[in-house]
């Protein structure tokens, strides 16, 4: 317990609690949780570009998202299927790393790049466009306006939401892979792609990688957020 206390601060715990509360508020929760969906679907899209094509991405009000891609070979399909949950966990880790180093502007620019790429190239449904424009405006505001403490707190909320969602969404897919193995999203897709690895193992893999990134964050001390 003492070792854990040395790795986190009360401020980190406070923002995790805030993230959990915010993501469970009707309507608002779905709106802010979409940031994780954006990262997840962007992960699929970016990896699909290596030997494949991204047709469209749809972002829906219920926080679900769909990336339509085509691939020229098996490996492209395989790595595209893995990329979604991996990107969610990695960007959550990266966000806290930047915040712990007080490098706020690079983090905002990275998040803006995700928004810009999707708005210009892939997202075409009405809600997806609305969400990207509104959230993109927030990032632009953070980039040019606001005190350091305001920017840090806003980014901490976003990073905390990404961390919470990366863990809960991968846990959900783990549960679905056992309860509904034929309707467990990426786990089902990878089971069909690999044929010999069942959805349950992919569900375990997705959850394990999210835990691994969280543990890596603890070891790196990136959750020790100063005032």
What are these regions (language model features)?
Residues 2-43:
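N-terminal signal-anchor transmembrane alpha helix
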Residues 26-77:
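Small-residue-rich helix-interface/hinge motifs
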Residues 5, 13, 57-222:
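Metalloprotease/metallohydrolase-associated module, dominated by Zn2+-dependent proteases
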Residues 11-15, 47, 51, 188:
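Short low-complexity stretches enriched in small and charged residues
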Residues 1-2, 222-227:
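Membrane-interfacial, low-structure loops and terminal tails that flank and connect transmembrane helices
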Residues 1-4, 47-52, 146-149:
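Short, mixed-charge, low-aromatic patches
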